[in-house]
Amino acid sequence: MAKGKDVRVTIFLECTSCVRNDIKKEFAGISRYITQKNRHNTPSRLELRKFCPYCYKHTIHGEIKK
């Protein structure tokens, strides 16, 4: 039986370097990935190194609010 809320939630990961450089308008957009995380194992914000097609390199992608 499930207890309360779902343990696994869907989150969005956004490129942190594109967000910072968006003010300068150097890149065409902001890279976002959709994934899931377990709330019990990782209660804090998730940060992963993923490939950003706008920066053309691997950067840190941080969890954002929906």
From Swiss-Prot:
Keywords of this entry: Chloroplast, Plastid, Ribonucleoprotein, Ribosomal protein
InterPro entries named in the record: Ribosomal_bL33, Ribosomal_bL33_CS, Ribosomal_bL33_sf, Ribosomal_zn-bd
Compartment(s): Plastid, Chloroplast
Any single Gene Ontology cellular-component annotation: chloroplast
Record GO terms (molecular function): structural constituent of ribosome
GO biological process, one term: translation
NCBIfam families, A to Z: PRK00504.1 (NF001764), PRK00595.1 (NF001860), rpmG_bact (TIGR01023)
Family the entry assigns: Belongs to the bacterial ribosomal protein bL33 family.
Protein name: Large ribosomal subunit protein bL33c
